[in-house]
Amino acid sequence: RLTVGFDYQHFGGKSWNKKVATGEHIPGVDKQMDEFAGYVDFRQDLGDWLSLNAGIRVDHHSHVGTEWIPQGGLSFHLPEQMEMKAMVSKGLRNPTIRERYMFPPQNPDLRAESLMNYELSFSQRALDGALFYGINLYYIDGDNMIMTVPTDGKPKNINTGEIENWGVESNISYRITSCWQIN
């Protein structure tokens, strides 16, 4: 299976404050930002027991620049309706107009946040498909995280550096009837 797509987002507008007493308009922000992205996602079964998933996205932001965002994974289809998956993906979040240009914490020099995500999961269907359960282990390594921090006694949005996050997720669901299911 091959999926190809394109995204376009336009952000912008004009802001101002109006003094109630005098009616005076005080100019605020008049900014525009555009984001273009093209992507390709590919999934291929390699026999009955293995699937390959791969994708790439190129994201261009009018103020931040261009970034390549890859992802890839393998799915192992095991006996007894069990499945194991391994995945690696990159994530990206561009700064918003508010974070860059509006209100006292604004900072026009912000860079995009970047994440690398690693996942390993196991799942199984049982009881003729009525029962489904799974567990997912993940690790996230992030850089350039945007936070509001005091700078010279005033709040300012800055790229603060690195983060690490890891954890375990689990899920279980049971289909009681064709109309009822509990999770």
Where are these regions (language model features)?
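Extracellular loop and loop/strand-boundary signature of outer-membrane beta-barrel proteins
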Residues: A21-V29, G55-H60, M102-P108, G153-N159, ...
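Outer-membrane beta-barrel translocator domains and adjoining extracellular loop/strand segments
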Residues: K14-G23, V64-P70, I97-F103, M145-G153
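Face-selective signature of the C-terminal outer-membrane beta-barrel domain
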Residues: R1-V64, H77-P79, L131-L137, N183
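Transmembrane beta-barrel architecture of outer-membrane proteins
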Residues: Y8-K14, D30-G38, V58-P70, V88-L92, ...
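A structural preference for long, well-packed, hydrophobic secondary-structure segments
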Residues: K18, M33, L50-L52, T66-I69, ...
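Membrane-embedded beta-barrel scaffold of Gram-negative outer-membrane proteins
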Residues: H77, E83-K85, A112-W166, N171-I182
